[in-house]
Amino acid sequence: MIEKELEGKNIAIVAMGESQLDFHLSLIHSNVYDEVWGINCMGAITKCDRVFMLDPPSRFLDTDDAGTQTGIMRRWLPNTKTPIYTCTLDERVPSAILYPLEEVAQATDSAYFNNTVPFAFAFALYQKVNSLNLFGIDFSYKGNVHFAEAGKACCEFWLSKCIEAGMIINVAPRSGLLDTNAPIEERLYGYHRLDDPDILVIDSEGT
């Protein structure tokens, strides 16, 4: 369902990667966001307006499959009042909301979702927000390189759709998303081999 109050808003999305630290630094430096959206257990440790948790609640409540996230989610899920977008409802999580998958997929003409974060990007595109500020979305999983590469590719696919729609995308400085943490002189393949490499930066006006 379209929420008119989200159209044109400035949104922060915070996930569990190291660059989540840049979110807290941004608050220290007086940055303000219309809403903060958390990914999974970030909702339990950061004040969020919405949380995206596309795994079924039972993954956290009935199994240990989520590893070290399990304990904090078991404490938080039954008690929070923060809206949690997920794939199925569970009476033990009273604030859970079904993610509007069909509406989002139809509106964005895509159903490419191989991890939780792209669901938040697609929701933002569907709601026509003005800007996304991305923190903790790093995909630096040393033990599962394939998952990291696949997840990053899916996220960057959705960010491309957001950019094409005119959305402003800001990525945390220490995140590898969109090669943001790469030295600026190394971001243009081939040119990076020159003694004096060209540097190309696209600003929010597209110039």
Predicted regions located by residue number:
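Metal-ion/cofactor- or nucleotide/acyl-coenzyme-handling active-site neighborhoods
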Residues: 1-207
